[in-house]
Amino acid sequence: MLTPNVVPDFTGLRVAVVGDLVADHYLFARPGRLSREAPVMVLRHCGEEVCPGGAASAALNLWNLGAQTLVLGVVAKDFNGREVLRQLEQGQIDVSGVMPIDDWVTPCKTRILGSDSGRTMQQLLRIDREPDVLVRTEVRSAIAKKLASLAGSIDALLISDHGYGLVGPEVAKAAHEIQEAGAVCVLDPRGDFSAFRGISAVLPNLRELGMATHRQVEDLMSHAALAEAARELLCRNGPEKLLVTLGNGGMVLFTRDEPQGITVRAAGEQAVIDVSGAGETAAAAFTLALAAGLEGPRAMRLANAAAGVVVMESGTAPCPLSRLRSALPNAPQPSQVSQPAPVRG
């Protein structure tokens, strides 16, 4: 029996990630002078890098935490797609399920970070380069077929949807087959996820919860409103666990047994440096914790601790196992919210 402050051994777990592979592109700069062309600052370029983002970031987190990791998705035959694959392969992640496709651009999020010398880089601007069309149906079907073939051979599946069209009914059908074969299946959603009814867990942020329940974020700011929306999803879409991530507000876990919610405040005592990739880190850690047999509240605490590690770093940084082991003993403990209400349906 593991004590609450011990991270389980994830090395025996085989985990697949399916979803939208993204390139996170960082441009680093130092302030120079005011421009004579416009009332803006001229920045002096001092470096850049491309990191795996989206589902690729989730895969890197799983691997860094010790799991045997497979990734399924698509990339374009462009520099960003090749670079994302190169870095995944460098980490000994199985990318045989990734399809390079024509008539596509690998989604790329360019973040410009700047600061004075000796200070922490802060994000100044983000520019997104996205494909003009969604992933084609025949490509989705091919990926889903590969995914379904993993049923019975993996311990967990993490579905990372960033809205580029890969995650659809075909992937949902394959996910149900994998879950029926005994694996934990976790969805990090974007928009409607009714096709994933009965899945092990869904991890929306506040905006995604609002999209799924047709509510504005402003209407979800009280715990009562949040719990009402969560109960609606538990009834309608029926995930076993609903973990709502609230940024610096922490996380709230809802289940049919705990419809009022179990909360945990955000981990980390320092000022947040960069939230890029924190969602993927939390999803990866939560998936592994469930696959290792932890109950929902303990899995949430571990995911919160992992997210608290990466927000202290600039860029899309995965959470190393050693850092998680150091952070977990100091991570906040979950607490129940005494606002019970029955879940029906």
Which role does the model predict for each range below?
Residues 16-18, 126, 155-158, 186, ...:
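Structural motif
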Residues 6, 15, 23-156, 318-345:
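Conserved N-terminal subdomain of the carbohydrate kinase-like
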Residues 10, 151-152, 196-197:
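A short, aliphatic-rich alpha-helical micro-motif
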Residues 164-261:
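Conserved phosphate/ATP/ADP-binding segment of small-molecule kinases
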Residues 237-240, 244, 267-331:
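Conserved post-catalytic alpha-helical subdomain immediately downstream of the catalytic base
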Residues 33-38, 199-207, 212, 250-279, ...:
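Flexible glycine/proline-rich, aromatic-decorated loop/lid segments
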Residues 21, 162, 281:
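Active-site metal-binding loops of divalent metal-dependent hydrolases
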Residues 158, 174, 183-195, 199, ...:
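Extended, hydrophobic alpha-helical segments in both membrane/secreted and soluble proteins
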